[in-house]
């Protein structure tokens, strides 16, 4: 019953950080990258099997709690810093010590900001195409195809790959 109460709460801090020291909360999206899977976007969820918070991928695999601090990065920080080229300005994201008052760090969620990310991708790359098929979003950027169940997640996946691999 304790786990049910935890899940109903508001973005519960889970007691660990990502590999850059950012506190992780229930429902946060994180980035994991390795040589085998490449770049993956996972969500912090309570796993009833292991009875702990894990980073769960849409395909069903997860990163266990004890590995979160060494294997994950908060998605919002990766998108803002690496893809949008912004920095922390007090409680806001901004540029050149100028905070963007519509981008408070605490509330910025890149999965919900897919319009901003898709528009930015569209300005940088001429070859941008999206389609939904069998409940899955497919996004093509510069001849590279990305797919996920949520449009916001596939947009973030493409943005991170483009930023890190200079697609």
Q: Predicted regions: what is each one?
A:
Residues 1-167:
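Secondary-structure transition motif
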């Amino acid at each position: 019953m304790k786990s049910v109460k935890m899940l109903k709460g508001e973005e519960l801090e889970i007691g660990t950080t990502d590999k850059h020291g950012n506190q992780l909360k229930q429902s946060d999206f994180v980035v994991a990258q390795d040589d085998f899977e490449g770049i993956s976007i996972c969500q912090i969820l309570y796993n009833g099997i292991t009875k702990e918070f894990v980073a769960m991928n849409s395909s069903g695999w997860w990163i266990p709690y004890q590995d979160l601090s060494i294997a994950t990065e908060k998605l919002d920080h990766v998108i803002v810093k690496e893809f949008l080229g912004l920095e922390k300005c007090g409680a806001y994201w901004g540029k050149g010590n100028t905070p963007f008052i519509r981008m408070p760090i605490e509330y910025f969620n890149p999965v919900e900001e897919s319009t901003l990310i898709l528009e930015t991708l569209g300005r940088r790359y001429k070859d941008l195409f999206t389609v939904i098929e069998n409940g899955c979003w497919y996004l093509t950027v510069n001849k590279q195809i990305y797919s996920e169940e949520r449009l916001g997640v596939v947009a973030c996946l493409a943005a991170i790959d483009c930023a890190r691999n200079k697609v």
